[in-house]
């Protein structure tokens, strides 16, 4: 059985986007290529246990083991040397990407305190969308007793859209909770 959001995308969202974006066929419709989750941890320089807990939490959130990212350059002011572990990231593709987006939109984001919608300014000019999450506690997979420190993460949704308008149309159709125009 495939991801629920992927089935909805192929049966309802894609045909609707063909009409909305005035495309010639369904293969031109923008789609989600991958979802990248990144946790940058500056504290990992002093305390390696912070990194271990972040890796464990990211594994629980997306069901895939993250890769530990290392510093590319040495920066003396930050007491950082090249090759030191400073974060972790996961790349989700195909069904796992759609399953994660489904959980993010329908379960995690509604749990954010005082949530009014996600920013429309997260597009990069090429149709990709980046979203910052301030605390990992919004995901139901995280056990609150085991959390030692609140950590944020970045979620980048890479699409096949050619520009921001197509990317916005795709994100809106998938169900990304952008604020309504009256509040702008």
Curated annotation (Swiss-Prot):
Name under which the protein is recorded: Large ribosomal subunit protein uL5
GO CC terms of this entry: ribonucleoprotein complex; ribosome
One Pfam family named in its UniProt record: Ribosomal_L5_C
Function summary: This is one of the proteins that bind and probably mediate the attachment of the 5S RNA into the large ribosomal subunit, where it forms part of the central protuberance. In the 70S ribosome it contacts protein S13 of the 30S subunit (bridge B1b), connecting the 2 subunits; this bridge is implicated in subunit movement. Contacts the P site tRNA; the 5S rRNA and some of its associated proteins might help stabilize positioning of ribosome-bound tRNAs.
GO BP of this protein: translation
Record-linked HAMAP family: Ribosomal_uL5_B (MF_01333_B)
Any GO molecular function: tRNA binding
Keyword annotations from UniProtKB, A to Z: Ribonucleoprotein, Ribosomal protein, RNA-binding, rRNA-binding, tRNA-binding
UniProt keyword annotation of Ribosomal protein present: yes
Record Gene3D superfamilies: 3.30.1440.10
InterPro entries the record matches: Ribosomal_uL5, Ribosomal_uL5_bac-type, Ribosomal_uL5_C, Ribosomal_uL5_CS, Ribosomal_uL5_dom_sf, Ribosomal_uL5_N
Keyword check for rRNA-binding: yes
Organism of origin: Syntrophotalea carbinolica (strain DSM 2380 / NBRC 103641 / GraBd1)
NCBIfam families reported for this sequence: PRK00010.1 (NF000585)
Record family assignment: Belongs to the universal ribosomal protein uL5 family.
Record note on quaternary structure: Part of the 50S ribosomal subunit; part of the 5S rRNA/L5/L18/L25 subcomplex. Contacts the 5S rRNA and the P site tRNA. Forms a bridge to the 30S subunit in the 70S ribosome.
């Amino acid at each position: 059985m495939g991801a629920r959001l992927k089935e909805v995308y192929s049966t309802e969202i894609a045909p609707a986007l063909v009409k909305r974006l005035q495309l010639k066929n369904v293969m031109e419709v923008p789609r989600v290529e991958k979802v990248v989750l990144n946790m940058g941890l500056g504290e990992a320089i002093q305390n390696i246990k912070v990194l271990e807990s972040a890796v464990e939490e990211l594994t629980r959130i997306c069901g895939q083991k993250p890769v530990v990212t290392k510093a590319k350059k040495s920066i003396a002011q930050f007491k950082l040397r090249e090759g030191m572990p400073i974060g972790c990231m996961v790349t989700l593709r195909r069904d796992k990407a759609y399953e994660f987006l489904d959980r993010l939109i329908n379960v995690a984001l509604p749990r954010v305190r005082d949530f009014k919608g996600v920013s429309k300014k997260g597009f990069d000019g090429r149709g990709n969308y980046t979203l910052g999450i301030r605390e990992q506690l919004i995901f139901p997979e995280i056990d609150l007793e085991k959390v030692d420190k609140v950590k944020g993460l970045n979620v980048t949704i890479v699409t096949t859209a050619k520009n921001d308008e197509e990317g916005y149309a795709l994100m809106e159709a998938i169900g990304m909770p952008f604020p309504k125009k009256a509040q702008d």
